[in-house]
């Protein structure tokens, strides 16, 4: 009804006429807007849409080509939809459209040549962030004549190929990247065939670390040749290191962790998801002497003894991601509570921790839930809506919640009550994911009221992820009627992560 009345009001305003029989808005079109306002409107569009706007008229073409709209540019077709047909066209774009305004640039392999890099160095003095994608490369261009490279880079992301050796290129740029603060080396973890045996060290990390002494954030993601010696190499030269991520580097065992913390006194964030950590190496670290605040040890094989030893000695942990670990059981969580080291905890991820009981989780949340901003208790069949209904009144500060498991349960989840409890108790909620099988979700004809309450009470909610099914369609339609088109998403294409809580999250974003 409200939607209908809004439509009537809009149509009435459009039909309004004066005594002369003409609407006062008849001559009000977008053409009347000044260039400054149009430029601001265009800034909300993607570059692909801006290029389409340039075909409308000469004035819009002039605005679309304003360099202020081209500060952050991706020329990777699979990411932005933009494709530059030739190197000559790109050279023209760099000088005519990008120029001093360009801050961030992504280049695919076919556009990474010494001519392009020379032009960027000469015409784009304010370029500070760059991504170079070599993943699809079968052969590099000739860089023997490369004499210049953007020298003000603070952020560099290199997507590595499995078979192309980078040393010929890297050797030419070492003198230009000593100001780097953030380095991403992205491997081919998601594309690698597990049966392949040959592994090539396609980039020389030991030489790279000597050229980048000012690194604060290092992200080595899914690189199959990265091991503990490479971590040791970076720690020997990067004394300002604050964040180290080696997620899905399965050759990392933790053998150099003790040395890492002894050298890197500023290290606050350590992300080691999917690595091959060994308990004896982890227990050798002097955790009580570190200033570590953020730790990810998801999907590692650490023992219960090791987990107790580590967690009870880290003095001020704010972020813990420790899902999919068989050793994380009731005794670990109990010992951690008794140590008193949970007082600073803001984010807890215990996804798929099947050896934790309802009782110990309830005790932990009762004591520390009021301070938690992210709580991930998903992937456990025994954690149902009953436990969540008990702990939600405590999670007053929650910004991120993930609950439910994909496997079919023998019990049903009363989702209307759950939505009502979330809306009532979590006004700061920004991200929510329900992973339960849609066949387990039970809702009534009054579900719209519970969804309305969630939408109205949780005004900061920007992402809600549900499994595909009737309830997903119901919630999606509700939010779309309220013009919140992008909030409700499907588990097949979106997952909620607690990584938003990490202090250096913006620096860790890549690809």
Show where each model-derived region lies.
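N-terminal adaptor-interaction module of cullin-RING ubiquitin ligase components
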Residues: 1-221, 227-235, 243, 248, ...
């Amino acid at each position: 009804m409200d939607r209908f009345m809004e439509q009537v009001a809009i149509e009435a305003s459009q039909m309004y006429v004066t005594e002369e029989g003409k609407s006062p808005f008849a001559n009000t079109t977008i053409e009347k807007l000044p260039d400054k306002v149009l430029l601001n409107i265009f800034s909300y569009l993607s570059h692909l849409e801006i290029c389409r706007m340039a075909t409308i008229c000469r004035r819009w073409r002039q605005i679309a080509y304003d360099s202020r709209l081209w500060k952050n540019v991706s020329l990777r077709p699979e990411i932005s939809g933009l494709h530059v047909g030739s190197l000559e066209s790109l050279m023209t774009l760099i000088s005519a459209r990008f120029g001093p305004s360009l801050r961030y640039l992504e280049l695919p392999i076919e556009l990474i040549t010494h001519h392009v890099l020379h032009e960027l160095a000469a015409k784009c003095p304010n370029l500070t962030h760059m991504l170079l994608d070599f993943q699809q490369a079968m052969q590099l261009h000739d860089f023997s004549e490369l004499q210049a490279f953007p020298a003000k880079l603070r952020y560099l992301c290199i997507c590595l190929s499995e078979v192309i050796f980078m040393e010929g290129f890297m050797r030419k740029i070492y003198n230009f990247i000593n100001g780097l603060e953030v380095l991403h080396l992205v491997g081919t973890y998601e594309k690698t065939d597990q049966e392949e045996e040959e592994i090539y060290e396609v980039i020389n990390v030991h030489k790279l670390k000597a050229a980048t002494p000012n690194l604060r954030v290092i992200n080595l993601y899914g690189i199959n040749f990265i091991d503990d010696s490479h971590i040791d190499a970076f720690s020997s030269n990067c004394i300002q290191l604050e964040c180290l991520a080696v997620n899905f580097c399965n050759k990392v065992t933790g053998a150099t962790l003790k040395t890492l913390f002894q050298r890197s006194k500023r290290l606050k964030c350590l992300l080691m998801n999917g690595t091959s950590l060994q308990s004896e190496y982890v227990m050798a670290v002097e955790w009580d002497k570190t200033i570590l605040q953020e730790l990810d040890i998801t999907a590692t094989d650490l023992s219960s003894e090791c987990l107790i030893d580590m967690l009870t000695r880290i003095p001020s942990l704010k972020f813990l991601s420790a899902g999919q670990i068989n050793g994380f059981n009731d005794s670990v969580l109990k010992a951690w509570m008794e140590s008193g080291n949970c007082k600073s905890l803001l984010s807890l991820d215990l996804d798929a921790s099947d050896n934790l009981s309802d009782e110990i989780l309830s005790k932990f949340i009762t004591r520390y839930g009021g301070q938690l901003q992210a709580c991930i208790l998903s992937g456990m069949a025994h954690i149902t809506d009953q436990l969540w209904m008990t702990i939600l009144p405590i999670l007053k500060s929650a910004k991120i919640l993930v609950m439910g498991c994909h496997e079919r349960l023998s019990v049903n989840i009363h989702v209307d009550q759950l939505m009502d409890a979330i809306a009532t108790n979590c006004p700061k909620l920004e991200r929510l994911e329900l992973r339960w099988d849609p066949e387990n979700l039970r809702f009534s004809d009054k579900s719209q009221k519970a969804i309305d309450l969630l939408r109205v009470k949780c005004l900061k909610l920007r992402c809600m992820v549900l499994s595909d099914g009737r309830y997903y369609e119901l919630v999606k339609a509700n939010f779309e009627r309220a013009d919140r088109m992008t909030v409700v998403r499907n588990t097949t294409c979106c997952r909620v992560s607690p990584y938003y809580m990490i202090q250096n999250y913006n620096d860790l974003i890549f690809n």
